[in-house]
Amino acid sequence: MAKYSHFLPLFLALLFAPDLGAQTYYRSEEPHCTAPKDSTTLLGLDIVGEGFFRNDEYASDLVADYTLPGYRLRANLSYRPETRLPIELRLGVYNLYYWGATRYPAALAYQDLPYWRGDGDRYTRLRLLPYFQASIQPAAGWAILLGHLQGGAKHRLIEPLYNPELNLTADPEMGLQIRYEGQRTRLDTWVDWQSFIFRGDKHQEAFVFGLSTAQAFDFSPTDRLELQLQAVAHHRGGVLNERADTVHTWLNAALGAVYSHRFALPKHPLTLQAGLYGLAYSQRGEHYASDKGWGFLATAGLSWRRWQTELSHFYGYDFISPLGIPFAQSIGRAGRSHLLTHHPRYTAWQGSYRIIESEAYTFGVSGGLYIHPHSAHSISSFIEAYLSISPRFTLLHRRGR
């Protein structure tokens, strides 16, 4: 019994909470880039501070246990001139800090370290990056971004394609993004350029292409069916790349349908969602031990006010996703050249509660329990507290406003 004692607080929290759910609160107070701009502000100051404390109790043959205590901070000036088409320029700095850390790998992006981003022996005392974003809204519901993108949880990717924990660890995405938000249609496509190379550099050129789109069909005021297509493609290499065995391309895609029904309760509606996805994986470059794979994901969830809960089940065959959660992978800690299993599978129960949510801040807690029989230790869990504060200050008003 002592072996599982550290799961007891998490189990009780999941059991006695009205509803708990997936982690959808990351920067939830931040409006989508397609939302109408403030028509009165000419020059503003934006501050986005995210404090987090997350503890992962993971199966040792999949990924090591660890704790993430720290913050992400962004401060930028925003300039919104009065033009026929709304445009905005943001300039600032971004900082990632882990409590107790005294040095950080001097890589360009914090994913898959230290295989290709950096030489492995270069460090910096402070993780500070420039922030730049230029955006335009060419039509209602449309936005085009150059520079830093609106990424992470805003892409709405499923967990086998994108690990929610990257909202706390990955650097901001940079490149080009085109986004549309309509009443029934959603489109988000982007290129995240993670690594640029000059001749003689030891690391690779690398970028990620992503697509997240959905089309909804309303059968009644309370019933909706949404068809979704999601894809993430990674490429590493480049014409100037001089390293051997470092040109690779991976593609992950998912096609799914999500049904939702809203129950009209006296004060606040209760929403039920059920989804089914088919997933595919393909590789060029012989980096991983599997070239092709597939999987299925089934989800069911409830949301009520600021509470959410989700139950999901995944089953795959030789499936690998570079950005996905570790429990959906056919590989483990033994390395990329060795398949831990041909059949990765897990059942997950997750929940979150937005304790406070407003236009300027979000305070939430979440927890999750994973059961993965393909691992020697079949139970993993996490628990997390998250506080995001995003004040915006007007420095100059437009004339006549």
Identify the residue ranges that each predicted region occupies.
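Bacterial Sec-dependent N-terminal signal peptides
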Residues: M1-E29, I178, S381-L395, G400-R401
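Exposed, low-structure sequence patches enriched in small/polar residues
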Residues: T24, V48-F52, G70, Y131, ...
